[in-house]
Amino acid sequence: MTDLKKAAQRAIELMDLTTLNDDDTDQKVIDLCHKAKTAAGNTAAICIYPRFIPIARKTLDEIGAEDIQIATVTNFPHGNDDIAIAVLETRAAVAYGADEVDVVFPYRALMEGNETIGFELVKACKEACGEVLLKVIIESGVLADPALIRRASELSIDAGADFIKTSTGKVPVNATLEAAEIMLTVISEKNTQVGFKPAGGVRDAAQAAEFLGVAERILGADWVSPRTFRFGASSLLNSLLHTLELADAPKPTQGY
């Protein structure tokens, strides 16, 4: 197997296959569940809006893919600074049966100089999650400033995040290697088991390999696993399957 094929295989096993569109329906989520059970193995998770969790759980059970985790989103996509609402949404997501919750950090508040709200929001949402995995989306493409990306990562980890995630996929700039470098460095400096999730903008096996390479350089060759690294993506899967000669070439897309 070539290095590119190895990267494609790994990226599938590390993927949160995502649909977070305004026109999502039960049928689209059912189709997503079937896609997540690929000829190259299952993705790590699917990521969907909370209201679709019950139908996703039913579908994954029916197709024998119970090991695929169900992730959902809260305080999404704008990263508002109302802690009470973020906590209510997170509790509801857990009640729906989410295995993982991706919550948006109040990044605009941080840009305005308020560090407290972000820390307190993440802390409260982690308490609401209990054993459910909490991934914190810092929206690195909007923060832009390396110092802000670093600070959002630090605050999220200090407040109890299980993962830090680059992006919602709803802004012009999503995952970049530069943001990955900063976020992974913070994880390394804090000597923590917190994971990393680049989301949006990873289009093919070659780009996936670049992100994996940064993670391995900073945190070691044995660090990357579904417990510590995820790709948030939708269109990436078809490209990876094509690299593995298991699907036709994907059509050009502007999607996540």
Swiss-Prot record:
Keyword Cytoplasm: yes
A GO biological process held by the record: carbohydrate catabolic process
Pathway assigned in UniProt: Carbohydrate degradation; 2-deoxy-D-ribose 1-phosphate degradation; D-glyceraldehyde 3-phosphate and acetaldehyde from 2-deoxy-alpha-D-ribose 1-phosphate: step 2/2
Organism: Shewanella baltica (strain OS185)
Listed CDD domains: DeoC
Keyword Cytoplasm: yes
Reaction(s) the record says it catalyses: 2-deoxy-D-ribose 5-phosphate = D-glyceraldehyde 3-phosphate + acetaldehyde
Cellular localization per UniProt: Cytoplasm
SMART domains in alphabetical order: DeoC (SM01133)
Chief subcellular location: cytoplasm
Name of the protein in its database record: Deoxyribose-phosphate aldolase
Catalytic class of the enzyme: lyase
